[in-house]
Amino acid sequence: MQILIAKDGKVVYDKSFGTQDKYSSKKVKWTDLYDVASVTKVTATLPLLMLAVGENKINLEQTLGEIDAAAKNSNKSNLKIREILAHQAGLKPWIGFYNETVNVKNARLYLDYYARKQDAERQIKVTDNIFVINTIKDTIYEDIYKSPLGRKSYEYSDLGYYIFKQKLE
């Protein structure tokens, strides 16, 4: 873990702690790089979820089926919000959502999904000059709800953050 605090454009605290993962003895250094996408799930979705809990809109003991109609008819229905946040709900660690939209062997985007210019069917900006099909979000949530559950033991999963983001928007 790394913590950096800046005030008025100046770094006032910068410290690294621990090891790079639970299997490694390699210490975290200030030069280590992180996947920003994983950080944004926690820094954007988690504060909104905390606010919803603080305002009694969501209870950590509620199940996904209680807060999300799409979860009711899935194997995710009885998962408690608390279990999901603690990464103990049995959710898969990761789903390669892009696998259906990209030819991984030659690093080519499938044109059924992507376009260089924004059009009626491709409104979601991926990066400059690349837009993805509008239904991709529905596909992602469908893939999450259809995915199998594992054992209820600690295993990091970002899938809950996708669900919470959708419910909190």
Which residues are covered by each model-predicted region?
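Short glycine/serine- and small hydrophobic-enriched flexible loop segments
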Residues: 47-57, 162-169
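Short alpha-helical patches at coil-to-helix transitions and adjacent helical residues
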Residues: 39-46, 78, 156-161
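Glycine-rich, acidic and aromatic/proline-enriched surface loops and short helix-turn segments
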Residues: 8-10, 87-90, 129-135
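Catalytic-site signature segments of enzymes, centered on catalytic residues
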Residues: 33, 95-100, 104-169
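Active-site helix/loop module of the DD-peptidase/beta-lactamase fold
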Residues: 30, 35-39, 54-104, 145-146, ...
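Short, conserved catalytic-motif segment at the N-terminal edge
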Residues: 1-36, 57-59, 137-147
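Solvent-exposed loop/turn segments at secondary-structure junctions
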Residues: 11, 18, 22, 42, ...
